[in-house]
Design a protein with these regions (language model features):
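Membrane-embedded alpha-helical bundles that constitute the cytochrome b-like, heme-associated redox core
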Residues: 1-303
Length: 303
């Protein structure tokens, strides 16, 4: 052991360099000159921060673009049932305009494309998006058993989404009374016009007012806030902090609700103020309307 130690050469200590030699001051380690570098590819994302190839990306766009189609129908519908009656101040004088535009959105092709398919796609995409985010939460928290999954809360529902879910039964009831019921009982809705609505207000004022007021209020609020979201104008999309950010969010909230109030007021003025005061229909037309209203499930026996 002593011979082995004696054979070792003792060296003076020397300082060790703090860092290796760098050929590129942008990199800590030497860079191979033969290697080609490519800039990183950034994945596209939308305003909601969703990957362009992920399921939420497609679901959000289905919701968005389906609302475009139904908005076209809504514009025609508001014009026929509110704006034109408000201008003419007469139900009979407004009927020709309704009959003139009806073939464009009640034809076998236009009705599914503008109303049925977009509505179904809009609602289905919203439900699917919530289910997808729910499953994401299972993965994030590592929930495997049923008990663990129950302990994880569902994703928060926005105010606009709550209005949308509330709008479903209101819109379904409105469509059934004005489109489905005449189709079932008479084979079509050619006899359904503004006078059909006026007749309901004249004979069943309380029920008609509650139904139409609820439909207008919920529908306008959901639509206005939805469009504000697509346009990036909702308060939660304000990224600025501090007092200015708070004031900006508050201002947007008031502006969106003010726009909703104007649209709802315009619709109410023409739809309820003119059409709702048109009076009941007489003769066989009035009896036909009464028979249709009495055929409404659940509430028809009180009409």
């Amino acid at each position: 052991m002593a011979e082995d130690l004696a054979g070792l050469q003792q060296l003076d200590p020397s300082p060790v360099e703090d860092s290796p030699y760098e050929t590129n001051k942008e990199s800590y380690f030497p860079v191979d000159d033969t290697a080609t570098t490519t800039p990183p590819v950034l994945k596209r994302s939308d305003t909601f921060g969703l990957n362009s190839h992920s399921a939420p990306w497609y679901l959000v766009r289905i919701q968005k673009y389906s609302s475009y189609a139904f908005s076209i129908f809504s514009a025609f519908h508001i014009a026929n049932t509110s704006i034109i009656p408000l201008i003419t101040q007469s139900v009979p004088a407004s009927e020709p305009y309704l009959l003139l535009t009806r073939p464009y959105y009640q034809s076998p092709v236009a009705e599914p494309l503008l109303i049925g398919i977009p509505l179904f796609a809009h609602v289905a995409a919203g439900v699917a998006l919530r289910v997808y985010r729910r499953r994401q939460q299972y993965e994030w928290y590592g929930a495997e058993s049923r008990k663990e999954k129950r302990q994880i809360p569902w994703p928060k529902v926005s105010g606009s989404s709550k209005l949308g879910y509330l709008l479903i039964p209101l819109l379904a009831g409105h469509s059934f009374i004005n489109r489905g019921l005449p189709l079932i009982k008479e084979g079509g809705s050619s006899s359904i016009n503004l006078g059909y609505v006026s007749h309901a207000f004249a004979k069943y004022p309380a029920m008609s007012f509650v139904g139409f007021a609820s439909l207008i209020t919920v529908g306008v609020l959901h639509t206005t806030w939805g469009w504000a979201k697509w346009l990036g104008l909702t308060p939660e999309l304000v990224t600025q902090g501090g007092e200015e950010g708070r004031l900006s969010r508050k201002k947007r909230w008031y502006l969106i609700n003010a726009a909703s109030a104007v649209i709802a007021g315009l619709w109410t003025a023409g739809g309820l103020g003119v059409v709702g005061r048109g009076g009941k229909a007489g003769g066989w037309v009035g009896r036909e309307y009464d028979e249709l209203y009495r055929s409404i499930p659940l509430i028809g026996k009180w009409m």
